[in-house]
Regions:
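Transmembrane alpha-helices and adjacent helix-loop boundaries
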Residues: 1-321
Length: 321
């Protein structure tokens, strides 16, 4: 029932007052968080460099469409493939280590990628790629129409999330969970855990790249902020807020964080007029502080995230009913 309501709201969003570009931005980040959750929530690998896949796909899609004249479907494909190949290269090095060492290797690669994009001529440095055209999907559907693009993005994100669900519930996904819970036992059962972790890393990178390609298609630009380490931190926060290791948690976390960052100024103005505290007028300029406070609250108060806490509370009620 809840899923039907959610699907109904998403299908009707452009006609019930929702700003299509904002909702598409939320969908792109929701897919980014879901891709990251596949790695940390089900495989137990914490990456501090997932922003490099988002940015790589964004730059590849933007450049191929703006400079090479590729169609949207080819541009998205190029971006996703670029992120997948980068995931393969990084994964071959990173999976040889565990825990904090794995995280630091991904962070080191991400910083290296950031400085490459800062200097590379095709990224236009700090100016980024501006004015990326949306084009026509398969030469037929004009994506300059926000509503048309919205349904394309929605279909892609739903299909990608369905793919993640299928992966999680497949024998491959069960092996990933076994590696997360007890890698030594998985090895003793004869599984090549490094191979499974590498495949999970590549899948996560590819899906993060798909999110980056959709994002540049929606917004029409790609900047260095997508490659910076703070973007990797942001997707960690989205996953923690929603609920790590849950299917809907990262989607909810992404929606909340993106909405908060986008509407923080409006919230500050409302609080200032309600409470009379002038400081709230500058709340929109304090997004980093607010997200930091949210991160602390998650760690201290509800470590399982919103969806994780809800599931933990509902399960005993179902068992007793």
């Amino acid at each position: 029932m809840q899923r039907k309501v959610l699907y109904g709201v998403l299908l009707a969003a452009p006609f019930i007052g929702a700003y299509p570009v904002f909702v598409m931005k939320v969908l792109a980040f929701a897919l980014f968080a879901a891709a990251f959750n596949l790695l940390i929530g089900y495989t137990g690998l914490l990456s501090f460099g997932h922003a490099m896949f988002l940015a790589t796909a964004g730059y590849a899609t933007g450049y191929s469409m703006q400079t090479l004249g590729f169609t949207p479907e080819l541009g998205v494909l190029v971006g996703t493939v670029a992120a997948t190949l980068l995931g393969l290269v990084v994964g071959l090095f990173a999976i040889r280590r565990q825990g904090i060492y794995f995280a630091m290797i991904t962070l080191a690669f991400a910083q290296m990628v950031y400085f490459i994009y800062l200097q590379a001529p095709f990224t236009h440095g700090e100016d980024g790629l501006q004015g990326v055209p949306r084009g026509r999907l398969f030469g037929l559907l004009d994506l300059s129409n926000d509503v048309a693009l919205y349904y394309v993005v929605l279909a892609v994100v739903v299909a990608a999330c369905a793919f993640i669900v299928r992966v999680v519930h497949s024998p491959f996904g069960q092996v990933l969970v076994a590696i997360k819970e007890n890698e030594a036992r998985a090895i003793s059962l004869g599984y090549d855990t490094d191979r499974f972790k590498l495949l999970a890393f590549i899948l996560s990178a590819a899906l993060a790249g798909l999110a980056g390609s959709l994002k540049v298609l929606v917004l029409g630009f790609e900047t260095l902020s997508d490659a910076y380490w703070t973007m990797s931190g942001l997707v960690v926060l989205m996953t923690l807020v929603g609920g790590m290791g849950t299917l809907f948690g990262p989607l909810l976390g992404a929606a909340l964080i993106v909405a908060l960052e986008d509407r923080l100024g409006d919230i500050g103005e409302w609080l200032a007029s309600t409470t009379g505290v002038a400081w709230f007028h500058s709340l929109g300029e304090s997004a980093t502080i607010v997200t930091g406070l949210i991160f602390i609250a998650c760690v201290l108060a509800f470590r399982r995230g919103i969806v994780g806490e809800m599931v933990a509370r509902i399960k005993p009620l179902r068992a007793t009913s």
